[in-house]
Design a protein with these regions (language model features):
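Alpha-solenoid helical repeat architecture
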Residues: 93, 319-321, 359-364, 397, ...
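Internal alpha-solenoid helical repeat scaffolds
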Residues: 67, 71-77, 140, 178-179, ...
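Conserved phosphate-binding/catalytic loops and adjacent sensor/switch elements of nucleotide-binding enzymes
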Residues: 61, 65-132, 141, 254
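Conserved adenine-nucleotide phosphate-binding loops and their immediately adjacent elements
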Residues: 2-3, 12-41, 100, 255-258, ...
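Alpha-helical sensor/transducer elements of the RecA-like P-loop NTPase core
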Residues: 18, 96, 118, 145, ...
C-alpha cells in the first residue's frame, strides 16, 4: 500500500503540536507593556466622578487584549463583569448585545424608558451588591437599546462602562457624551514600540530574539499585535525562524503563507482596481514620491489609500515619500505577483523615475530593477548606483553591482564596495580572491586604496594579521606620493592599535596626521586610530577630547568607511569603562547597537553586541551580558568572523561562569581558544579575565594568577586603566595582598575614578575594616557597578558578623542582596555572604512585618495567636541585633527567598 491509515492515538500516544501553534497561543496570552493604559483604567474605576473609559486605536493594535487584561487584573475582584456581544448580527436586535445577561423576555423587547429601567435593574440584581462593569468591544456595533442602557447606567453611576472601538469608526454619541461631560476617560491605544515587540517575541518564543529580528518584525507589522502574531506563526511554520546559539533568529525574507496572505486580503478587500494598482507600485518601489503613482494611476487613488491608512505619506527634507503601512502588506503583495507582471511593474517604475525629477538614491533602484529584469544599464550608471548602495549600507546590492562594474572594466572604482561589501556579508575569503584578481591600477592613489581594502579584509575579515601587515608595507614601498602613502600608513596605524601595539599605533597615526591633508580620509583614519590608542593609554582629560575631535571626520567619511564608527565607539566605551563611568559606557554601546539594528548591519550589530556585553559585565548585569554575547556569537558564527567570535565567546564564558554554568563556560572558552584570534588582540585581556572566572567557577586553584597574567598583558601595552581593572579582579578572586601596592601606584596614574576605588577596595579587604568596606561599597556604587558594590557590602557584613555586631552585619547583608539584584551572580564575596539563620516561619513573619503588616494581620494569615507572632518577631530581632519593626523594614531584602544563590560555592576555594 502506498498510503496506510495512521494509527488512532490513545491516551498514551504523545501528540505532535506544531511549534507555530504553541507560539500562536503564547502570543495570544502575551501581555507586555500597556502599564500606563492599565493604570489609567484602574484610576478611572477608583475615581468617584468617572463612570467609563474608552479605548481608541487602530485595528489590530491590541485593544481587545487590553480589555481582557483589564477585566482580569482590575475588574474581577471587586466588580461584576458584564461582557457585551457587540457585532453586526445583533446590531438591529434591541438589547441584543446584553441578551445573555438579561432574562429571556428582554430579547426583542420594545426599546423604551420602561424597558431600559427594567434591564438596568436586572443587571444590578445579578451583580449581588457589586458594581457592574459593562465591557464592550467594538462599541460602534452596539444596538441602540444596548447603547442607551450602557449610557444611562453610566450617567447614574450604576455601572462603569469599559469600551473599545476602532479609531476609523465613528464613536457613538452617548459614549462621546460621557467623555465630553467629564464622566469618562479617553485612552488612546498605540501600536507596540520596538522594545515591546521584543518583549512579546521573547515571551512567545521562550527566549530572547536578536535585535535585527525585533526591528524587522516591528517595521513589518507597524507594532500591531494581530499582524505580529500571524507573522511569527508563518515564520515558525516555514522554518524561517529558529534558535541559534541561544537566541531566536530569522533567515531570509519573511515567508508568505496562505494564512498570512488571507489576513492581508481581508484588510484590502473592497478596494477598487486603481487603489490596488497604487499599492502594487508601492509594494515594488516604495518609498516613492506620491507623484509617481499619481502619474501612473491617478491622484484620487493615492489620496484614497492614504485616507484608509494603508499608505503613509511623510516628508524627508524637501521631498515627500509614500510607503505602505505596515510594510508587511508589501511583502505579501510582491510574493503574490506573477513573474511577468512583476517585471512589467519594475519597468514602469524605472521609466517613471527616469522621466521625472529624481534623487541620487532613485538611480540605485532604477539600476537594480533593470538588472533584475535582465537589462544591462550603462557602466557609469552601475558605478554610481554601486556607490550609493554602499553609502546606504546595502551590502548585497553594492557587492552585486560591484561585480557588474568589474565585468564592465570598472574594477578600480569597484574595489571598496566589492571588498567591504563581501566582507560584511560574511564572504571575506571570496572578497580576497576577487580583489586579488583585479588588474593592477595605474594610479598610485588607486593602488594604495586597493591595498587598504584588501588589508582590512585580511585582518578583520579573515584574521590574517601578518598577511595584512605585509600587504600594507608592500603598498608603502610601491607608492611614492605623500598623499598616496598616507592612507596605507593610517590603516597600518589602526591595525597596530587593534592588535595591542597602542604606543606604536599612536606614534604612526600622529605622523600621518602631520603629513596628510586635514580633510583627507587618511587623516581621518589616523585620527580615529590615535583616539582609540589614547583611550587605553591616557587619562580621561586626554582621551575624551581626542575621541570627541575624531567624531566629526569619522561622520564625514562614514559613507565610504563605515567601520570608522566601530573603532571610534570601541574607544569611547573603553575610555568610559577604564576610567569609571560605567553608565555612560553602557549608554554609548546601546546607542551604537540601536543604530546598527536600524540600518540592518549584522557585522556592526555583532561588534556592538561585544561592547554592550562588556558594559553589562562592568555593571554586573549578568542576563544582559549573556543575551548580548549569545546574539553576537550567532551573528559572528554566521559571518564566519573568527576575531569577533572568539572575543564574544570569551565574554559568554565569563557570563556563564558567573551564573554557575561551569561546564558550558569551559566549552565556550575552549572554542574561543581554537585558534586564538589576532586581529583584535587589544581586547584579549578581557578573554584572559574570563579565563580566570571560569577557573574560579570550577574550583581550580590559581584563578587569581590567571587574572594577574591579564594585568601583565595590559601593562605591556601601556594600558594603565586596564591593568588596574585586572588587578582588582585578582583582589576579588581572593588575593588583595598580592596587588595592593601596584593598585596604589596606578590610582595616581590611570586617571578617572575607577583606579582609586579599586585600590581602596583592595586596601579594605587587606585590613578587614568594616567601615572601610562600607565606604568602598558606596564608592563602587557611584561608579555604576552595583555588583562590585554588593561584593564590598557582603564582605563588610561578614566582618561585622565576625566582630559580633549583628545589626551592622544585617544592614550590610541586606544592602549586598539589594545591590546584587535578581541575576544571581556567583562571586566569591557573594557566595561567602552569611545570612542570618532564621527558621522558615521566622523568615515568613519577618518579611510580612517588614512590609508593614500588623501582628494581628499576620496572625490571621498563619492562623496563629498574636502572642506567637510577637514571640517569633522577638527572636528575629535578637538574631539580627535590632530592636523594633522600624529597623526591620530597612532589612526587607534579607527575607526574599532565592534572591541570591546559597553560600559556599566552589569560587571560595578557587583563589
Amino acid at each position: 500500500m502506498l498510503l496506510e491509515a495512521a494509527p488512532v492515538p490513545d491516551e498514551r500516544t504523545p501528540l505532535y503540536v506544531p511549534r507555530s501553534w504553541v507560539a500562536m497561543a503564547e502570543l495570544g496570552r502575551a501581555f507586555v507593556g500597556r502599564r500606563t493604559e492599565l493604570g489609567r483604567i484602574a484610576a478611572a474605576m477608583r475615581h468617584p466622578d468617572l463612570s467609563g473609559a474608552a479605548l481608541i486605536g487602530e485595528g489590530g493594535v491590541g485593544k481587545s487584549r487590553l480589555l481582557t487584561e483589564a477585566v482580569r487584573q482590575v475588574c474581577r475582584r471587586h466588580h461584576f463583569v458584564v461582557c457585551a456581544a457587540a457585532c453586526q448580527a445583533t446590531s438591529s436586535v434591541p438589547f441584543g448585545a446584553f441578551a445573555q445577561h438579561l432574562p429571556p423576555e428582554f430579547t426583542g423587547t420594545a426599546f423604551n424608558g420602561g424597558s431600559l429601567r427594567l434591564a438596568a435593574d436586572a443587571l444590578i440584581g445579578r451583580a449581588g451588591g457589586r458594581k457592574p462593569v459593562l465591557v464592550i468591544d467594538d462599541v460602534h456595533l452596539l444596538d441602540p437599546a444596548s447603547l442607551a442602557l450602557a449610557f444611562q447606567m453610566a450617567r447614574r453611576h450604576e455601572a462603569f462602562v469599559l469600551a473599545a472601538t476602532h479609531s476609523a469608526e465613528a464613536v457613538p454619541d452617548p459614549i462621546t457624551g460621557l467623555w465630553t461631560s467629564g464622566m469618562a476617560e479617553w485612552i488612546e491605544v498605540r501600536p507596540f514600540s520596538r522594545e515591546e515587540v521584543g518583549e512579546v517575541l521573547e515571551h512567545a518564543l521562550g527566549g530572547p530574539a536578536e535585535g535585527m529580528l525585533v526591528q524587522r518584525c516591528w517595521e513589518a507589522t507597524g507594532g500591531k499585535a494581530f499582524l505580529l502574531r500571524e507573522l511569527v506563526a508563518a515564520m515558525l511554520e516555514t522554518g524561517t525562524l529558529a534558535p541559534a546559539d541561544g537566541v531566536w533568529r530569522a533567515s531570509g525574507p519573511f515567508p508568505v503563507t496562505l494564512r498570512l496572505a488571507g489576513v492581508v486580503d481581508r484588510r484590502l478587500a473592497g478596494l477598487g482596481d486603481d487603489c490596488r494598482r497604487v499599492l502594487e507600485l508601492l509594494a515594488f518601489g516604495g518609498p516613492l514620491s506620491p507623484d509617481v503613482p499619481a502619474r501612473l494611476v491617478s491622484r484620487p487613488a493615492v489620496e484614497a489609500v492614504e485616507a484608509l491608512g494603508i499608505v503613509e505619506v511623510t516628508r524627508l527634507g524637501d521631498r515627500e515619500q509614500a510607503r505602505l503601512t505596515p510594510s508587511l502588506y508589501g511583502e505579501v503583495l510582491r510574493a503574490r505577483t506573477p513573474r511577468l507582471r512583476a517585471r512589467r511593474v519594475r519597468e514602469e517604475l524605472a521609466a517613471a523615475l527616469e522621466a521625472g525629477p529624481h534623487a541620487r538614491e532613485d538611480l540605485r533602484r532604477v539600476v537594480a530593477w533593470r538588472l533584475e529584469n535582465g537589462v544591462r544599464p550603462p557602466a557609469e550608471s552601475v558605478v554610481a548606483a554601486m556607490r550609493d548602495a554602499w553609502a546606504h549600507l546595502d551590502h548585497e546590492l553594492s557587492a552585486e553591482l560591484a561585480a557588474h562594474a568589474v565585468a564592465a572594466g570598472q574594477g578600480t572604482r569597484a574595489a571598496e564596495p566589492l571588498g567591504y561589501g563581501l566582507m560584511f556579508l560574511g564572504r571575506a575569503r571570496e572578497a580576497e580572491e576577487r580583489l586579488a584578481r583585479l588588474p593592477r591600477p595605474a594610479a598610485e592613489r588607486d593602488r594604495a586604496r586597493l591595498a587598504c581594502v584588501r588589508a582590512f579584509n585580511l585582518a578583520f575579515g579573515l584574521d590574517s594579521v601578518r598577511a595584512a601587515r605585509a600587504l600594507l608595507h608592500s603598498a608603502l614601498r610601491d607608492v611614492a606620493g605623500v598623499e598616496s602613502r598616507a592612507e596605507p600608513a593610517a590603516v597600518l596605524a589602526l591595525l597596530d592599535v587593534a592588535t595591542g601595539r597602542c604606543r606604536a599605533g599612536a606614534g604612526l597615526a600622529e605622523k600621518v596626521m602631520a603629513e596628510a591633508p586635514h580633510d583627507s580620509r587618511a587623516h581621518c583614519v589616523a585620527e580615529v586610530a590615535r583616539a582609540v590608542a589614547l583611550a587605553f593609554l591616557r587619562p580621561p582629560e586626554e582621551s575624551f577630547p581626542a575621541l570627541e575631535r575624531a567624531r566629526e571626520p569619522a561622520l564625514r567619511h562614514q559613507a565610504e568607511l563605515p567601520w570608522l564608527e566601530f573603532f571610534l565607539e570601541l574607544g569611547w566605551v573603553h575610555a568610559c569603562l577604564l576610567t569609571g563611568d560605567f553608565p555612560r559606557a553602557q549608554a554609548r554601546a546601546a546607542a551604537a547597537y540601536d543604530r546598527a539594528v536600524e540600518r540592518r548591519f549584522p557585522f556592526a550589530i555583532a561588534w556592538f553586541c561585544l561592547l554592550r556585553a562588556l558594559a553589562a559585565r562592568a555593571r554586573g548585569e549578568l542576563r544582559e551580558q549573556l543575551h548580548r554575547c549569545r546574539e553576537g556569537v550567532a551573528i559572528a558564527r554566521e559571518l564566519g568572523n573568527r576575531g569577533l567570535l572568539a572575543l564574544l565567546l570569551g565574554q559568554l564564558a565569563h557570563g556563564l561562569a558567573l551564573s554557575g554554568q561551569t561546564a558550558a563556560a569551559r566549552e565556550a572558552l575552549a572554542e574561543a581558544d581554537e585558534p586564538a584570534q589576532r586581529s583584535l588582540w587589544l581586547l584579549q585581556p578581557w578573554t584572559e579575565l574570563a579565563r580566570s572566572w571560569v577557573a574560579a567557577a570550577g574550583g581550580s586553584p590559581g584563578a587569581s594568577a590567571i587574572a594577574e597574567r591579564a594585568a601583565a598583558l595590559a601593562r605591556e601595552s601601556g594600558a594603565a586603566g586596564f591593568e588596574s581593572l585586572a588587578l582588582h579582579e585578582v583582589a576579588r578572586l581572593g588575593e588583595p595582598g598580592h596587588v595592593l601596592d601596584r593598585l596604589g601606584e596606578l590610582a595616581g596614574r590611570a586617571g578617572g575614578d575607577a583606579a582609586p576605588q579599586y585600590a581602596a577596595h583592595a586596601a579594605a579587604l587587606v585590613t578587614g575594616d568594616g567601615d572601610a568596606l562600607a565606604a568602598s561599597s558606596a564608592g563602587l556604587e557611584r561608579l555604576g557597578s552595583p555588583l562590585l558594590a554588593a561584593e564590598a557590602a557582603a564582605e563588610e557584613a561578614n566582618r561585622h558578623r565576625a566582630a559580633g555586631n549583628l545589626a551592622a552585619a544585617a544592614a550590610a547583608a541586606a544592602r549586598a542582596l539589594r545591590l546584587a539584584g535578581p541575576d544571581g551572580a556567583r562571586t566569591p564575596a557573594l557566595e561567602a555572604l552569611e545570612r542570618p539563620r532564621l527558621t522558615r516561619r521566622e523568615r515568613e513573619i519577618a518579611e510580612l512585618a517588614a512590609a508593614g503588616m500588623s501582628s494581628k494581620e499576620i496572625s490571621l494569615r498563619f492562623v496563629l495567636s498574636v502572642r506567637t507572632v510577637e514571640n517569633h518577631l522577638q527572636r528575629v530581632y535578637r538574631k539580627l541585633g535590632i530592636g523594633d519593626r522600624a529597623e526591620l523594614a530597612s532589612l526587607l531584602d534579607l527575607f526574599h527567598p532565592g534572591s541570591h544563590p546559597a553560600s559556599g560555592g566552589d569560587m571560595n576555594r578557587a583563589a
